[in-house]
């Protein structure tokens, strides 16, 4: 299945009309952070703090953009996280920022406005502190309510994070395969093993940096013992390393 995804992406890379979308996709994948810890706290039904709510909002926004970019390609299945976005972005700004917005609580909005007004009027510190404590209690209540409202989306968030991680890996492998002129091997269950244009990627890269070329090798290995002969420094060790690396990969 992973091989099919890689091949599909390699085909997409070869089509010029996909270049802009693939660049945007790469940029979005670079913005994704590992939020497994936050998702784990959701599973334990804990109250999330502002940083964790920010992580969920940022990931949900990013995942939705990625879903829009790859949905028609059918490379990975990304669940819809728009309900998560609506919970954490009540004002609909769709920016990677989180705050206990006034929209969450009319009482909190009133308290904040009162604190601001009394501060401008030079109210006593004790009075302002009392109002501030009330606002903190209301903010904690909002966090608790949000944490409860987000719990039904735990599985979707977990699935989306795994799918985005898989997409990142197969995209990188496809890009590496194209740049390195790599092919998907056909592995026989028995019989001879054939390598065409075999090379060692690291050694080839070093030679190219020095303005030299790597001599690719065609090789057929049959069941039994194979003896490699040749002059000193003729490439026997490099050939063995290339075969070993190809076999390992």
Task: Show where each model-derived region lies.
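Charged/polar positions within long, soluble alpha-helices
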Residues: 14, 37-44, 65-75, 113-120, ...
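Extended, charged alpha-helical coiled-coil/arm scaffolds that mediate oligomerization and mechanical coupling
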Residues: 83-162, 166
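Conserved NTPase motor "head" modules and their coupling/switch loops across ABC/AAA+ ATPases, GTPases
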Residues: 162-234, 247-249
């Amino acid at each position: 299945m992973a091989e099919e995804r890689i091949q599909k992406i390699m085909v997409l890379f070869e089509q010029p009309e996909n270049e802009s979308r693939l660049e945007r996709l790469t940029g979005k994948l670079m913005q994704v952070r590992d939020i497994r810890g936050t998702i784990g706290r959701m599973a334990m039904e804990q109250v999330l703090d502002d940083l964790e709510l920010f992580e969920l909002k940022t990931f949900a926004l990013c995942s939705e953009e990625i879903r829009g970019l790859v949905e028609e390609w059918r490379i990975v299945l990304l669940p819809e996280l728009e309900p998560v976005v609506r919970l954490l972005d009540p004002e609909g700004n769709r920016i990677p920022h989180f705050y206990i917005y006034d929209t969450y609580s009319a009482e909190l909005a009133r308290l904040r406005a009162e604190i601001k007004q009394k501060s401008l009027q030079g109210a006593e510190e004790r009075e302002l502190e009392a109002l501030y404590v009330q606002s903190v209690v209301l903010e904690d209540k909002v966090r608790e309510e949000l944490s409860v409202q987000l719990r039904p989306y735990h599985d979707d968030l977990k699935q989306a994070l795994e799918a985005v991680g898989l997409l990142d890996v197969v995209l990188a492998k496809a890009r590496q395969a194209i740049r390195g002129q790599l092919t998907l091997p056909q592995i026989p269950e028995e019989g001879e093993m054939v390598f065409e244009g075999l090379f060692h990627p690291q050694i080839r890269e070093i030679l190219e940096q020095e303005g030299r070329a790597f001599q690719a090798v065609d090789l057929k290995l049959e069941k039994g013992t194979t003896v490699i002969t040749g002059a000193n420094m003729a490439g026997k060790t490099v050939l063995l390393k290339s075969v070993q690396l190809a076999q390992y990969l």
